[in-house]
Amino acid sequence: MSRYQAALLGLGLLLMFLLYMGLPGPPKQTSQLGRGPNVTVLTGLTRGSSQIFYREVLPLQQTHRAEVVFLHGKAFNSHTWEQLGTLQLLSKRGYRAVAVDLPGFGNSAPSKEVSTESGRVELLEGVLRDLQLQNTVLVSPSLSGSYALPFLMQSHHQLCGFVPIAPTSTRNYAQEQFQAVKTPTLILYGELDHTLARESLQQLRHLPNHSVVKLHNAGHACYLHKPEAFHLALLAFLDHLP
């Protein structure tokens, strides 16, 4: 190769490099959901013999919307919903939201009173009463189904919405019991959850007023694997409640 050809080749490579550097890169994938003013997360303990630790956010704008209560799974606690940004997001969207530590988890002491189904129902009723929660939507993942399902069966008149996320304890109730519950329900589960999600979905489908959202490429804790998709589905459900 002559010096002239080598020079032309070098010039061509330089021009290609400069052109490449000037091209715009791929757009950053940022979420619009969490933007806005900062939100203060309050903490406290309920009254009574079984004191329950909770985290709470108030709506940044005064609304008359539903109030959302978050339970949690076996490996989690109320802090999960703060870390995920769920509490803060709902506050910005005009919702009051409360996340509780179930007995024996997080900052709540163990309690013998929740060893029975009736005791677990009474505990949730006490939380709603102590915190003066009304028009409540109950969000129940995994293990917390042992609290949420008996509460739904016995006290569904206290709920304006129910969001089960592959909960336990669905087998404890007959098809007719589910059919008697008219509470609007959003059934959420992860596509990759091949055990509890399928089992619970079989039973929860008997609820007469339900919709189903499957989060793709998400496992049992689908809200952790696909938080933005989870938040979008939850907000769409809440925003359309009467």
Swiss-Prot record:
Belongs to the AB hydrolase superfamily. ABHD14 family. It is found in: Cytoplasm; Membrane. The active site is at S142 (charge relay system), D193 (charge relay system), H220 (charge relay system). Possible role in granule neuron development. This is Protein ABHD14A. Keywords: Cytoplasm, Glycoprotein, Hydrolase, Membrane, Signal-anchor, Transmembrane, Transmembrane helix. Its EC number is 3.-.-.-. Pfam families: Abhydrolase_6. The chain crosses the membrane at residues 6-26. Glycans are attached at N38. It comes from Rattus norvegicus (Rat). GO terms for molecular function: hydrolase activity. GO terms for cellular component: cytoplasm; membrane.
